[in-house]
Amino acid sequence: MKGIILTGGHGSRLYPSTLATNKQLLPVFDKPMIYYPLTTLIENGVVDICIITNPNSTSNFKKLLGDGSHLGVKITYKVQKEPNGIPEAFVIAKSFLNRDDGVALVLGDNIYYGANDILTDAFLNFGSGATVFGYRVEDPERYGVVEMSGNKVLSIEEKPKKPKSNYAIPGLYLFDYDVIEIAENLRPSKRGELEITDVIKAYLRDDSLNVFKLPRGTVWLDAGTSSSLFDSSAYVQAIEKRQGIKIGCPEEATYNQGNISKTELRKLIKGIPNCEYKDYLSNILKYE
């Protein structure tokens, strides 16, 4: 499976912090925001990743992540000139995708924690069609909502006034190659954008849409506003301080996946300046 991280847009909800930088380069506690979705993909076996960003941010992402080789992955960069909606990512990344591979799309400001088994099951067993996830929320009318029976989707609604369930669809999706044709044939909504809900509904009409319910205790954070960015940082800090582990650490994730060797991790650590992050990575080798 290949992966796409969507980091386009203007980050207007985080103005003025995003005047000089891309939203996904802002810190969520102790690391750049993009580290979190990148780690989600790596933890679930994805090693071929496309980062789609706006025209002004490519060089900064390349400075941060390079071609991914130090992490044992391959990172490709493509540009979304205007924020025309999530589905445009599949059109932009058409040359990156292969017919025989599924693709995982994760939004660059989304953070997931505590659902590793469910996500890994969904990634490993993905064959065709599309897979979304259901996350229980208190206020489903603010989200795209999935009504389900087991792993079968009954309906999809976008910000319904009277939701049929209290399960929102977070910004992580699995699709087969057909998603490109579906995205290419979409028409903009009243907002003037292509809508990911319309892509999902196309699979629902074809009876090829599955859903995995994220279990109780799973954390899904959207760090796309000033308040949610602060809350996300506070949550990550609390977990890391209490448990002594890092959330969203791609170096640790890729080492655990076997993408880099112990020698390669040591070399990577050597290139990091003296800091708490370096100490954490060093302790991975020290205490294993």
Placement of each model-derived feature along the sequence:
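Short coil/turn connectors at secondary-structure junctions
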Residues: 1, 46-47, 72-74, 99-102, ...
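Conserved N-terminal catalytic core of the sugar/cofactor nucleotidyltransferase
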Residues: 2-5, 13-16, 26-27, 31-107, ...
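A structural signal for short hydrophobic beta-strand segments in well-ordered beta-sheet cores
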Residues: 25, 146-148
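Short, conserved catalytic or adaptor-binding loops enriched in Gly and charged residues
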Residues: 66-72, 147, 202-204
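Catalytic-core segments of class I nucleotidyltransferases/pyrophosphorylases
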Residues: 104, 120-124, 152-252, 256, ...
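Conserved donor-nucleotide/metal-binding helix-loop-beta segment in metal-dependent transferases, i.e.
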Residues: 114-141
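Generic C-terminus detector
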Residues: 255-288
